[in-house]
Amino acid sequence: FTTSQIKGSSCIVEYFEPLASTGLGMFTITGLGHAYRFVGEAKAQDCEVDVNCVPEGTGQTAQRDGAVRISVKEGTLLGWCSGSLINNRAQDCKAYYLTAFHCGVNASTADFTAWKFYFKYQRSGCDSGAASTGSSVTGCVKRGDSNDGGGNTGSDFLLLEGEDAIPTSYNPYWYGWDANNTNPGSGVRCIHHPNGDEKKISTVNTIQSSSAWNGIQAQTHWRVTWAGTTNGWGVTEGGSSGSSIYNSSGLIVGTLTGGGSYCNSVQPNGQLQPDYYGKLSYHWESNGGPASDDLKNFLDPNNTGLKVMTGSYGPCGTLGMDDADGFEAPGVSPNPADGQVNITLPEGLKDASRIDVLDLSGRLVVSMRIGTDNTKL
């Protein structure tokens, strides 16, 4: 068990035991993290954008609900990282958290039991409203990693499984993902906790298909630059490490290793500098470590070979997808097909603006916007 931050220079620990066991109980405080100033007052840089700002956060509610702040412990060191709750093809509601390996490259099994995952740590408005630390779970075990020293020679991923189920009151969202090595193009975003602060959102300007974190492995990372938006110019900071970038369909395609972006008030022209995200396609099975550590073993446990997975608020529910009540699937004919197909949308999807067509391997075949007649394409 680990507490959240306690404000002040002293605290009282109370222990209650059954009357029949009076004086027999014992407990040990294994460690104490002390900050010389209240770390809750540490704030992100001034150009960052709150996740509930409009228009930046509009339509990003699910991805917001799947992003977590992580209190990390490595020996005597404490710090912040970001991460994402991620779905798997078994859709069994396992509490898998995807983050960066460098966040815990030296963490022991005992250290991981003290890691704390905060949901819903965000302002209710745009630069307004208080954030609560009350929605958290403690403890995890390591499942897989990039075996690269924290990005030295690979894509820098760490997959953890929470020791406890996530309370439904947290309204957790399990992110979907795309493990194809395809440039996600436009509409890419990142939700993160810079400097351990309330949840922020950053909007991608450009994304380079292949890059490297340290110049050794050229195919491991996406090189990203950020765009100015209505309410700021979202960048990344310490504490953002491990956060995901996701494509226009809301699917994770990479996790943050680091980079050179800053608000201009901190470093002139810092908002134009790039950051680097380890590719989920490289996490999949390309890092060269033990095959048992590959991400695909956990996200595709039944070895279907499919590389695209949708996100869900309840993956182990009856249908295992968002808003499943009364769901009607789009009509596709002929199916299978090797040429032209007709797609008919049910009433529940009449407001859809785009259609993505995937083949049986999960590869994106075509993506198109729906025309003026939005019931048939």
Regions found by a protein language model. Give the residues of each.
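Exposed aromatic-hydrophobic patches
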Residues: 1-3, 376-377
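Serine endopeptidase catalytic core focused on the charge-relay Asp
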Residues: 5-224, 238
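Catalytic nucleophile loop of clan PA
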Residues: 84-92, 233-256
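C-terminal subregion of chymotrypsin/trypsin-like serine protease catalytic domains
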Residues: 97, 109, 123, 127-139, ...
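Short hydrophobic alpha-helix segments
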Residues: 101, 256, 368-369
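Residue-level detector of functionally pivotal "anchor" positions at catalytic/ligand-binding pockets or at interdomain
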Residues: 209-213, 296-333, 346-350, 363
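C-terminal outer-membrane/trafficking sorting elements
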Residues: 323-333, 337-377
